[in-house]
Swiss-Prot record:
<keyword id="KW-0113">Calvin cycle</keyword>
<keyword id="KW-0456">Lyase</keyword>
<keyword id="KW-0602">Photosynthesis</keyword>
<keyword id="KW-0460">Magnesium</keyword>
<dbReference type="InterPro" id="IPR020888">
    <property type="entry name" value="RuBisCO_lsuI"/>
</dbReference>
<feature type="site" description="Transition state stabilizer">
    <location>
        <position position="337"/>
    </location>
</feature>
<dbReference type="GO" id="GO:0009507">
    <property type="term" value="C:chloroplast"/>
</dbReference>
<feature type="binding site" description="via carbamate group">
    <location>
        <position position="205"/>
    </location>
    <ligand>
        <name>Mg(2+)</name>
    </ligand>
</feature>
<keyword id="KW-0934">Plastid</keyword>
<dbReference type="InterPro" id="IPR020878">
    <property type="entry name" value="RuBisCo_large_chain_AS"/>
</dbReference>
<keyword id="KW-0503">Monooxygenase</keyword>
<feature type="binding site">
    <location>
        <position position="298"/>
    </location>
    <ligand>
        <name>substrate</name>
    </ligand>
</feature>
<feature type="binding site">
    <location>
        <position position="208"/>
    </location>
    <ligand>
        <name>Mg(2+)</name>
    </ligand>
</feature>
<comment type="function">
    <text>RuBisCO catalyzes two reactions: the carboxylation of D-ribulose 1,5-bisphosphate, the primary event in carbon dioxide fixation, as well as the oxidative fragmentation of the pentose substrate in the photorespiration process. Both reactions occur simultaneously and in competition at the same active site.</text>
</comment>
<keyword id="KW-0560">Oxidoreductase</keyword>
<dbReference type="InterPro" id="IPR017443">
    <property type="entry name" value="RuBisCO_lsu_fd_N"/>
</dbReference>
<keyword id="KW-0150">Chloroplast</keyword>
């Protein structure tokens, strides 16, 4: 609804008296606001500048991420400005942290273009993050209404269809990243792909920064990689794949590479998060049209997701990427070399895999979310994992995940094929023990030792990496609620 005559007169009068009205008084703060089912909700962690009231800071965030500027403008009176103003409706101190606050903000759905991550982010994480009134600002979580989600296609393939295409059920997918990630010739690269797949992996993959460099151009990589895929598939009698990274400088180049990946028989292609939201959505539309699985590497996310008080939590990226339409996204390992609190990672996985999620503060989920039947995204666990951790990986991450052992395959002393076999035997022995009703978490090391009695490559892997772990205190453990999370 538009403003009343009295309200317009008051605002106009105050503007001419001072030129500036506090954001809270301009209508961007409403403690009595009744949330609509169609509202988009955002939770920000704000650190106001000294002397700035947290309610005023929250109202400023609401204003600057929707319709406001630094002063009242008379053209507000030409719009339904009451409707279009975002409303900060709740501010809570962050427990056990001084001078930080959680600000809950509601946005009317009409503020955003349908089906556009770029337009959504231009408001939610736009200029507001440089606002001087706050020392730091972090987007912790969002709730997307069903009406808005229905304007997005969601994952191009999704978990269920991918399992059917791969004919893999009842266990995680197994993969590995080609190492070294840069410098191999095309022929040697294809040999790595072949050896890994022949040894028992389901997937090999390009890494995030292999595109089309002087030592190996993209077309050469695609041809040799698919030669390895086809030979290994024929040898093993299983469907296998290799994530061909089609990331490039322009969309024209990316489409050309994606089309060629399909022509040479690939079932999956890959992009990097750094290409941007519009390019990601464009590639997701292409992948659905061409029946291709679309893998997303989250390269670049830690530049804004690791800091506790500024940037954006990775769970928000998970939500946006499910909307955008990717089929895979790297989402953490818990036990590997990369950042990841166990409960936070569980929250990421639930965001990608569940049809409905409830509020769960230890997992960092501040809002309940109905996913409006969007397909499930397969989380990918990679970075510093090896066969000796298989019981932990299965316990923390479950079946619906791609476990990628890069160094844990290619670093095996007996060769790549032996490394792949070690991982396949470790996984299948653990899944079998679980299905038999054994306490595979407590008995995990013994289960692996028993399996290694008849699998030399697994024994070698266990001997080599038995003491390898990455026990660092996580930077992303919840500080706003007590959790049982240990440093694992």
């Amino acid at each position: 609804m538009s403003q009343s005559v009295e309200s317009r007169t008051r605002i106009k009068s105050e503007r001419y008296e001072s030129g500036v009205i506090p954001y809270a008084k301009m209508g961007y703060w409403d403690a009595d606001y009744v949330i609509k089912e169609t509202d988009i909700l955002a939770l920000f962690r704000i650190t106001p500048q000294p002397g700035v009231d947290p309610i005023e800071a929250s109202a400023a965030i609401a204003g600057e991420s929707s319709t406001a500027t630094w002063t009242v403008v008379w053209t507000d009176l030409l719009t339904a400005c009451d409707l279009y103003r975002a409303k900060a409706y709740r501010v809570d101190p962050v427990p056990n942290v001084a001078d930080q606050y959680f600000a809950y903000i509601a946005y009317d759905i009409d503020l955003f273009e349908e089906g556009s991550i770029a337009n959504l982010t231009a408001s939610i994480i736009g200029n507001v993050f440089g606002f001087k009134a706050v020392k730091a600002l972090r987007l912790e979580d969002m709730r997307m209404p069903v009406a808005y989600l229905k304007t997005f296609q969601g994952p191009a393939t999704g978990l269920i269809v991918e399992r059917e295409r791969m004919d893999k059920f009842g266990r995680p997918f197994l993969g590995a990243t080609v190492k070294p990630k840069l410098g191999l010739s095309g022929k040697n690269y294809g040999r790595v792909v072949y050896e890994g797949l022949k040894g028992g992996l389901d997937f090999l993959k390009d890494d995030e920064n292999i595109n089309s460099q002087p030592f190996m151009r993209w077309r050469e990589r695609f041809l040799y990689s698919m030669e390895g895929v086809n030979k290994a598939s024929a040898s093993a009698g299983e469907i296998k794949g290799h994530y061909l990274n089609v990331t490039a400088a322009t969309m024209e180049d990316m489409y050309e590479r994606a089309e060629f990946s399909k022509e040479v028989g690939s079932i999956i292609c890959m992009i990097d998060l750094v290409i941007g939201y519009t390019a990601i959505q464009s590639m997701a539309i292409w992948a659905r049209k061409h029946d291709m699985i679309l893998h997303l590497h989250r390269a670049g996310n830690s530049t804004y997701s690791r800091q506790k008080n500024h940037g954006m939590n990775f769970r928000v990226i998970c939500k946006w990427m499910r909307m955008a339409g990717v089929d895979h996204i790297h989402a953490g390992t818990v036990v590997g070399k990369l950042e990841g609190d166990p409960l936070m990672i569980k929250g990421f996985y639930n965001t990608l895999l569940e049809s409905d999620t409830d509020i769960n503060l230890p997992q960092g989920l501040f809002f309940a979310q109905n996913w409006a039947s969007l397909r499930k995204v397969v989380p990918v666990a990679s970075g510093g994992i090896h066969a000796g951790q298989m019981h932990q990986l299965l316990d923390y991450l479950g079946d619906d995940v791609v476990l990628q052992f890069g160094g844990g395959t290619i670093g095996h002393p007996d060769g790549i094929q032996a490394g792949a076999t070690a991982n396949r035997v470790a996984l299948e022995s653990m899944v079998m023990a679980r299905n038999e009703g054994r306490n595979y978490v407590a008995e995990g090391p013994q289960i692996l030792r028993d399996a290694a009695k008849t699998c030399g490559p697994l024994q070698t892997a266990l001997d080599l990496w038995k003491d390898i772990s990455f026990n660092y205190t996580s930077t992303d453990t919840a500080d706003f609620v007590e959790t049982p999370t240990a440093n694992i």
